[in-house]
Design a protein with these regions (language model features):
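A SIS-like phosphosugar-recognition module
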Residues: 149, 217-218
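C-terminal helical cap(s) of enzyme catalytic domains, especially alpha/beta-barrels
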Residues: 220-236
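HKD (HxKxxxxD) catalytic microenvironment of the phospholipase D
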Residues: 231, 251-252
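TerminUS-proximal long segments
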Residues: 252-264
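Long, low-complexity, intrinsically disordered extramembrane tails
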Residues: 239-244
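Alpha/beta enzyme core
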Residues: 1-210, 223, 263-291
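Short acidic/histidine-rich active-site segments
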Residues: 211-215
Length: 291
């Protein structure tokens, strides 16, 4: 964070924004043990999340790494990969500490990576962060890595179960199944997904919502659908009806793909340099004029 701030100063960037992203909430390994000089300092707080076991000189092995923690000699659990393991269920606490530390040391916004889109979970962490940094602002990734349908259906299922509603017609682990699409549970889940951004901003203090990689998925899905139609019963109509016709009627500029690739710009330059002798790509007979 200090390096980024220094770069802003060197480059004369007066309105640069630093977003500090935590490790994923579900991440359970680390490659390092923090330096600590006294009990309770930042390094000591970080090390407190390590999965350790108390040892003595009798059960100490060659090459073991040991630290002093709370007056005891402990051995952090080290995997064959040489990574150290965090204690189970410390993810939220680690993200909270990471976020507070980042904000106190120059970050403008924090970005917490959760393992599911759950407003209550996000709000709980932000409440803890704001106890120390009241004006903390969160960037949240509405990630395609989440199974949004299953997650929200399970959240509705759990809520119905807690309130004593009849859930006998649902199987929690199978809620992604199409057979549930028209059920009240699925409709409630979709309503929650629809209002997720507004609800999360209001209830969990999310300052900015982003979504990573959506066009990767839309490109893959549309290409798959086109291939099925073009090489299936629809033939060329699969492209015309579901792509080109929609481009024209919805005013998508890419329908003139020659223009979007710069053909007009190229022709202008050719004409400027060669005049009437210019060999231009466009002209009255160019297919682009059909659009």
């Amino acid at each position: 964070i200090n390096a980024v701030r220094y770069a802003f100063l060197e480059l004369g960037v007066d309105d640069g924004i630093i977003v500090a992203r935590t490790d994923s909430l579900g991440a359970g390994l680390t490659k390092q043990i923090a330096i600590t000089n006294e009990e309770g300092d930042l390094g000591d707080q970080y090390n407190s999340f390590l999965d350790v076991e108390e040892i003595s000189s009798e059960n100490m092995n060659h090459g073991d790494v040991m630290i002093s923690q709370n007056g005891k000699v402990v051995r952090p659990k080290r995997l064959p990969s040489n990574l150290y393991q965090f204690r189970k269920d410390t993810g939220e606490a680690r993200c909270i500490l990471d976020s507070i530390t980042s904000l106190q040391n120059g970050a403008d916004l924090i970005w917490i990576e959760t393992e599911k889109p759950h407003i209550g979970q996000i709000a709980g962490m932000m409440d803890e962060i704001k106890k120390v940094v009241p004006n903390a602002k969160l960037v949240y990734n509405n990630s395609p890595s989440f199974n949004w349908t299953l997650s929200f259906r399970q959240q509705v299922f759990d809520s119905m179960s807690e309130s004593g509603e009849d859930i006998s017609s649902y199987e929690r682990d199978d809620l992604m199944n199409e057979k549930y699409d028209d059920t009240d549970l699925a409709k409630k889940a979709d309503d929650s997904i629809r209002s997720f951004q507004a609800d999360a901003s209001k209830e969990a203090g999310i300052f900015h919502h982003l979504i990573t990689l959506p066009t990767y998925h839309t490109a893959a899905l549309s290409t798959d659908n086109l291939a099925k139609e073009y090489f299936g019963s629809e033939g060329m109509l699969g492209y015309v009806a579901n792509v080109q016709r929609k481009e024209i009627r919805e005013g998508i500029a890419c329908v003139k793909h020659q223009n979007m690739s710069g053909s007009d710009m190229g022709d202008d330059h050719k004409e400027y340099f060669a005049g009437d002798a210019a060999l231009k790509a466009a002209g009255k007979d160019n297919t682009m004029n059909q659009f």
